[in-house]
A protein has these predicted regions:
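Glycine-centered loop/turn positions within well-structured domains
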Residues: 66, 137, 145-147, 155
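Conserved short histidine dyad/triad with adjacent acidic residue
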Residues: 34
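A generic "structured core" feature
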Residues: 40-41, 79, 132, 138, ...
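Flexible, glycine/small-residue-enriched loop-and-beta-strand segment within the central core
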Residues: 38-47, 52-126, 152, 160-161
Length: 184
């Protein structure tokens, strides 16, 4: 009985969250799935078509932005930090929460990416098209298209597809003008 009540409340919350929150995003494509609770400021996030954010995803620091391309998914418990603290002479560390002199930027996740559960995307992270980030990885830099990365810091451990498979995959998902070429 208690379990049924829990699922009932969860389903009501989820449907409310999915129908009311998308309008608050900087940009929100169609067929976007938001599985709350999410700890984000939607005005700092752009979501492409057919994207998914799983529960307990959080974005720390106001001022930075997150762009998520179409067909991408962010797993449960991911943390996105689009800022970098800059040490300031004369400012004690305990006041760093004031974010004086912080650098912020946009973290970009290209199309068709999968960010594994519990991963961290830090300042200067940029995820190339089709990349897969293993669970609990810490990304601190550019990840090339169709790379599979894992670890802390995230390192390339494989490629998602062969070049021929990438070209076939691109032909299925994208119109000719959006496809990657063999050289890319």
């Amino acid at each position: 009985m208690l379990l049924n009540l829990r699922f009932f409340i969860y389903n009501i919350f989820s449907s409310f969250f999915r129908t009311t929150v998308p309008s608050k995003f900087k940009q929100c494509g169609h067929d976007v799935e938001l599985n709350g609770p999410l700890y984000i400021n939607p005005t700092q996030i752009s979501l492409g078509n057919h994207t998914r954010l799983q529960s307990t995803t959080r974005m720390i620091v106001d001022g930075g932005y997150l762009n998520v391309g179409k067909y991408s998914a962010i797993g449960a418990g991911c943390t996105i930090i689009p800022a970098n603290h800059i040490p300031t002479v004369g400012l004690p560390q305990f006041l760093s929460y004031l974010h004086i002199n912080d650098n912020t930027r946009t973290i970009s996740i290209a199309e068709d990416c999968w960010i594994g559960a519990g991963s961290w995307l830090l300042y200067k992270s940029e995820i190339g098209r089709g990349a897969v980030i293993g669970a609990c990885s810490v990304v601190t830099k550019y990840i090339p298209p169709y790379a599979v990365v894992s670890g802390n810091p995230a390192k390339i451990i494989a490629t998602r597809f062969t070049i021929e498979q990438i070209l076939e995959h691109e032909a299925i998902l994208y119109p000719p003008q959006e496809r990657m070429s063999r050289e890319e």
